[in-house]
Every structure is written in structure tokens, then in C-alpha cells.
Amino acid sequence: MTSKLKVLQVIPKLGYGGAETGCYDLAHFLGENDCLSCIVTSGGELVRFINKKKVKLIKLPVQSKNPILILFNAIALVFIILFNNISIVHVRSRAPAWSCLLATKITRRKFVTTFHGTYNFKNSVKKFYNSVMVRSSLIIAGSNFIFLHVNRNYSKYLNVKKRFLVIFRGINVDYFESSTISESEENQQLKDWGLDKSKK
């Protein structure tokens, strides 16, 4: 059976932040739903939890802002995209976004970015560097605040050909379902936090 989608996510380091856990969760969701799911990262705490049967993990120095390494990563990504027949490249950070932009231009694959925060831009050079996050064909803002921030500060890089939308961060409601926690676990947690059960 052929995969429905072939998605490559690129993230500097797979730690415990919002962008990182979002990447991790999406990678496993895709892998569990008959899609080819790949992550390119330099490493991080979450790497050891990746289910290698569901998600293909490739390590590259994508955390680096060094222009030579950005170019090296772009060339490596071209080979990864072609070898795995990737259809969508999704990135959540600026330095690897430049590598992904180059790689998707060469391979003509769909390029998606998620704008998670308000990047510092004290001068036009920094603003240009940040602008890579709005140079994709689909731009995702993590909140209404970020959506307004991007429209206000990067409007010259936006055009009608680009889709720009808000996708709010979600949680797995099955995992956080209160009925899955035993009364003894709940009591222990309340005790650990110094909370009174009668006041909840």
C-alpha cells in the first residue's frame, strides 16, 4: 500500500517546547495514519521517545545559523526529499527554514512554515532573516496574536498567493482524560502539590 502523504518536518532540536512537542505529536499521528513521516533534527530530549517504526529520524546540524551549514543542510535536504519522495516540508524555525526554502525551490515541493513566536528585529537585516518564515506557500500562526503580529510586521512578504491561517495548539483529550487517573494517583498528586481535595 502506498502512503497517503509524505511529510518531512524540520526542527533545530527536539526538546520539550511547544514547537518541538507539536512536531513530535504530528509526526506520530502521521505515522500511525499510513503516511510517511520524517523528522530532521540535530537531536534533543524527545529523540529517544520516537517510535522508529512509525517515524523516520534523520540527524543534521539544522540548529546552526552558520551560512555554510545552512547551505550544507539545504543540499542534504534535497537528497532526503528526493530519496523519500517527500511531498510536504514543514519547518518551525528560521535557520532551518532557509535550508528548507532552498531545498523546496530546487525540488519543487510544498513548503509550510509555522510562526510560533515574535522574533526580535532591531534592524532590517534581522527582519529579512526572520522573513523566511513567511516565504512559504502556507504559513501557520500559532495564535491570533501571532497572526496579527505577522500581518503588522511582515506584510510586504505576504501576498494573495500565500495561504496564512491560525491553527491553535491542541491536546490529546484521551491522554488527559480525568477518568484514566485512579483515585490514589489523584490523591498522591494533590498531596505532592499541597492542595486540599475538598477545595477543588
Regions found by a protein language model. Give the residues of each.
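Alpha-helix capping/helix-boundary segments
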Residues: 45-46, 95-96, 145-147
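N-terminal strand-loop element at the rim of the active site
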Residues: 5, 9-17, 21-68, 156-163
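Short beta-strand scaffold positions
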Residues: 40-42, 90-91, 141-142
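Conserved donor-binding/catalytic core segment of Leloir-type glycosyltransferases
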Residues: 8, 196-200
